[in-house]
Every structure is written in structure tokens, then in C-alpha cells.
């Protein structure tokens, strides 16, 4: 919920509870659970009427009890930076990693982004290797289902890893890191060009295109496919593969010339990643505190990770400062409701 949004303002007392004795009694009766040891605040003065209509779900089933990702997310959400740091430093969970960079040119960053962590958490080499190794024979016509199957596998492999940034500008922002990853992939010969369009380029839709049926936030990958007809029939040309999101695993292919509102997406902002999840997610923080750095942003970045999470820190202390800060939400609706009640 964004800062100033209505839902966040209406539910701002949900964490503390503030149930009246009557509400508490009703909850205990219908649930069979005692609230005595819940730690929830009690509204004995009738000053929180809206809280009687709000319930907060407190148990996440997304991460298991022993999940380092789940525990780290809880410490961040509770604004406990010391506990979060202790978990990161202990290295006792095989799903949470931390990389402290020595300086801006530290090549450990490139190694992580390309290779990941050993056998499990992947980097960008994974999807590009699959792209090359699983490509159908070049004499297969475009109608052959092997092309669609291959494109689907590449798209799924790309979801194995995503780099998230807090900011857009600077060496630790989306723009600088997209260029840095592109340079590293070119040097490793995992891509064959750094021009605007090349095979393997992942792109993010930045605006809805109803004519193409593509929405803001959709991710596609440029692939070489055989031309179907005309003087260049059979020749490999670039098309961008997008998942159809139809529940059937379908893939649509779009010519790059038809895509006007796209950007390279080796790195994306945490804001753009909301609603998505990736097997291995890496969150890189800037080297100085920034107004957007809050516990909400850190929490969102952590919870985009399905199986593994890596925190990348160019400078010590920024993570702790961010966790101590929270978004101030104020839509004005609560003030109006309070005046109406009074």
C-alpha cells in the first residue's frame, strides 16, 4: 500500500489491535482462541471504533517456520535492525545471503549477478545458457511447437533470478546497474551485442499497450526465430517473447519495432517488482541514505524472493538506517471519519 493510500490509513491501528472488551469477547467466542496472551491493546474508552471492523492476518504461510527469508522479513517489518543483522551475519540459513562490497568496482558483484551462489541460487548465466543450449534445430519451421516450448523455458529460467534496486539513478540504481550487467554479460560472451536489440535482452513494459495486449510490468525476452514467409523466409530474426498469462503457458511473439515503451530489466526498482516473485532475489542498496529507503521498501524487496534472498551492501549501516524508518501514511480520510464520529 503506497504512502497516502486509503487502505493503509484505515488499517493503521491493525498491528496493535485496539479491540473493545465486547469485540474481544466475540472473537474468543467465535474462534475458540484466548486473546489473553496476544499482546493486543484493549480499547476500554471506545476511542477506536474503526478498529472493531479490522483484522490483521499475522501468520504467513508463504515461508516455512525455519525459513531465513521469513524470519528476516519479520525482523525488518518489526523494525528490529539489530536482530536482522544478527540473522544475516550468522549465515545459519541456506536461503539468505549477504554480500558487502569493498568499493564501487568490486568484481564480486559481477560474479554474483552472473553465477549466483553455487548449485542453488542462480544468476543471469542460467537463462542465457538455457537459451543457447536448448534452442531448436535451425531448420525447424516457426509453426513447430518446439519454438514456443523453448521460449517458455527461457522466460521461466529468467524468473530464476532478479536484481532489485531502491533507486533509478547513480551507480547503484537501475540505469547504472543495467549497463553494468550488460557489460559483464558481453565480456563473458553470454550476449553477442550491447546495441539496443540483441538476443537475450530482457525488457520490461513501462506502459500499457492495449493494441498488443501487453501491460505495464510485463517482462519479455528477445529471441531469434525463423521468419515465416517472404524473401527472408527461414532466416533468423529477432522477436520478443512474452508469456500470455492465460494459465495455459502460452507465449506471444512481438517484433521489437512494435515495442515503444520498454526498458532493459536486468535490474528493476523494488516498486516495479511488487506483485512478482523470483526464485532468487538480490536487493542492492545505495551507498547513502535516500528518502525512499524505508522498512517497507526493504520488506517488499525481501518478500519478492521465493527460495533465496541476497542483500548487497555497497556501504555498511545503510540497511540498519532504512529499517529504522517507515513510510508515513496520511490520506486525510481518518481525520474526516473521526470528525464525523465526534
Language-model features, listed with the residues they occupy:
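A general structural-boundary detector
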Residues: 44, 60, 187-190, 207, ...
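Short hydrophobic-aromatic micro-motifs
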Residues: 163, 204-205, 283, 311
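Flexible, glycine/threonine-enriched loop-and-boundary segments that flank and lead into catalytic domains
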Residues: 206-219, 223
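Short glycine-/acidic-enriched loop or helix-start segments at secondary-structure transitions
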Residues: 2, 175, 214-215, 293, ...
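C-terminal accessory regions
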Residues: 78, 218-342
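Conserved helicase motor core of P-loop NTPases
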Residues: 1-203, 209-212
Amino acid at each position: 500500500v503506497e504512502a497516502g493510500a486509503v487502505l493503509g490509513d484505515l488499517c493503521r491501528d491493525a498491528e496493535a489491535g485496539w479491540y473493545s472488551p465486547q469485540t474481544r469477547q466475540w472473537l474468543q467466542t467465535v474462534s475458540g482462541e484466548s486473546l489473553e496472551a496476544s499482546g493486543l491493546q484493549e480499547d476500554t474508552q471506545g476511542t477506536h471504533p474503526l478498529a472493531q471492523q479490522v483484522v490483521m492476518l499475522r501468520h504467513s504461510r508463504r515461508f516455512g517456520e525455519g525459513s531465513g527469508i521469513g524470519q528476516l522479513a519479520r525482523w525488518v517489518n518489526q523494525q528490529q535492525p539489530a536482530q536482522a543483522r544478527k540473522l544475516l551475519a550468522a549465515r545459519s540459513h541456506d536461503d539468505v545471503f549477504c554480500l558487502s562490497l569493498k568499493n564501487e568496482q568490486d568484481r564480486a558483484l559481477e560474479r554474483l549477478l552472473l553465477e549466483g551462489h553455487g548449485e542453488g541460487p542462480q544468476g543471469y548465466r542460467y537463462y542465457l545458457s538455457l537459451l543457447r543450449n536448448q534452442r531448436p534445430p535451425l531448420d525447424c519451421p516457426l509453426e513447430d511447437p518446439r519454438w514456443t516450448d523453448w521460449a517458455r523455458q527461457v522466460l521461466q529460467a529468467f524468473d530464476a533470478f532478479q536484481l532489485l534496486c531502491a533507486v533509478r539513478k547513480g551507480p547503484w540504481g537501475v540505469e547504472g546497474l543495467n549497463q553494468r550487467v550488460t557489460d559483464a554479460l558481453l565480456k563473458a560472451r553470454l550476449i553477442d551485442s550491447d546495441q539496443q536489440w540483441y538476443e537475450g535482452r530482457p525488457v520490461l513494459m513501462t506502459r500499457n499497450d492495449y493494441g498488443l495486449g501487453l501491460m505495464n510490468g510485463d517482462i519479455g525476452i528477445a529471441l531469434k526465430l525463423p521468419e515465416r514467409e517472404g524473401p527472408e523466409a527461414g532466416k533468423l530474426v529477432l522477436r520478443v517473447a512474452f508469456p500470455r498469462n492465460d494459465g495455459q503457458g502460452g507465449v506471444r511473439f512481438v517484433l521489437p519495432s512494435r515495442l515503444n515503451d520498454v526498458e532493459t530489466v536486468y535490474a528493476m526498482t523494488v516498486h516495479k517488482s511488487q506483485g512478482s516473485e523470483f526464485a532468487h532475489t538480490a536487493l542492492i542498496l545505495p551507498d547513502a541514505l535516500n528518502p525512499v529507503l524505508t522498512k517497507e521498501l526493504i520488506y517488499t524487496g525481501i518478500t519478492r524472493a521465493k527460495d533465496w534472498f541476497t542483500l548487497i551492501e555497497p556501504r555498511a549501516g545503510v540497511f540498519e538506517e532504512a529499517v529504522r524508518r517507515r513510510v508515513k501514511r496520511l490520506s486525510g480520510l481518518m481525520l474526516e471519519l473521526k470528525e464525523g464520529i465526534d
